[in-house]
Structure formats: C-alpha cells, structure tokens
Amino acid sequence: ERPFTADDMVYQGTIDIIRVNLKVGPTWTYAIIYLAEDLPENGTMKYGLEIDLDENGRGDLLIQTGVPRSIDWSVNDVQVYQDLDGDVGGERPMKNDDPVEGLNGYESLLFDSGEGGDPDLIWVRRNPDDPKSLQIAYKTDLIGYTGYLWSAWADDGLLAIDYRDYNDRFTEESAGSPYPGSPIYPIKSLYLIDTTCRSYFGFTPTGNEPGLCP
C-alpha cells in the first residue's frame, strides 16, 4: 500500500482501497471498489481491475476508469488494455526485478469511452448507496468463465499504462518505503498507488498462485 505523496508522506484516502466486491453474472460482472474516504468529485486518479487469465502472476487485461462524475452509468473515461506480448511482470511476476528496459506494459487498447469492438462493453458510476465507492460493470464475455485471478488498484501517481508492473521499473531504494522503520523510508519514485492481493474466480487455487490473497 502506497496511498501517500512522495517524500512528505501525505496520506490520500481517495487512493486507499479498503475492500472490493466482485459479482459474476451470466451477462454482466459487477465490481465495487470501496475507499477509505469519499470518492472525489473530480481529479486525475484512476481506478480499475487487473485480470490474470492463466494464473501465472502476469496481468493480461487492465480495466481502468477515471473518477465517475455521476450515479448514472457511463462509458466516459473508461478503457480496457491488453498485454499481448506477455511482458507485464518482468522476469519474475509479482516480485521486484531490477529495472528492465524495453518493457511496454499494456500496449493494446481494446476499448476507450465507448469506442471499440463493443461500444457497450464497460460502464462505470458512483455508487448511489455509498459515497466512498464506485461501481464497474463489464460484460462477462470480456473474460468468460474459464477461471482467473483478479485484483483492484487505484493510482494517482505515475498513471503509466506502459510502465506496468511498476515494481519492475525502480530499485527498492529509488521507490522508497511507506514504513517509518525502513532504511529507505520515505516513499520516493513509487507513490500514490494502492493495489489489492489477487482473488480468484472459476477455479480452485492450489495456494501457489503469485499474489494470491491469504
């Protein structure tokens, strides 16, 4: 968890994910991301889901949205990206690698604010029942029922799709640490980002899947 500004460590509750609910239906899948503080009216932050289709620790699909402006469903400022060349995660998925040049993260844009193969693919809104959360709805066919790992994230720092995974872009020293007792405290290059561990759907995990929630 790094929902803090760089160097001065100012906490940002609008980036701090408390929990996430995912409900998969025959037509639509719904995700609700709950934050520590009220969802802002506007801002540069992004929220979303990362999907690992083959449970190897590498994200395959990235769903992201800007701050929803209304409790009405909208496709505005919503994107879906895909990693076609499998470089997300670097050499060791879900672990810190030495900074690697040439990684391109999520390089393929599948959906952008209603533009794409299916203009109805993904919708978002502010949660009308909870000011500290947002809702994402996407067609279940985007991923299917074959089983996958998923996690949620919030970002108001690097905001760089081509830099995923962030932990493969910086040394531990340059990234810094959020823990006051650490010799590399405070947070430096890797800031204002929060992610969850990975939950599963559609299969029984062995317990060895990278990033799996305990």
State the predicted function of each range.
Residues 1-214:
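Surface-exposed extracytoplasmic segments
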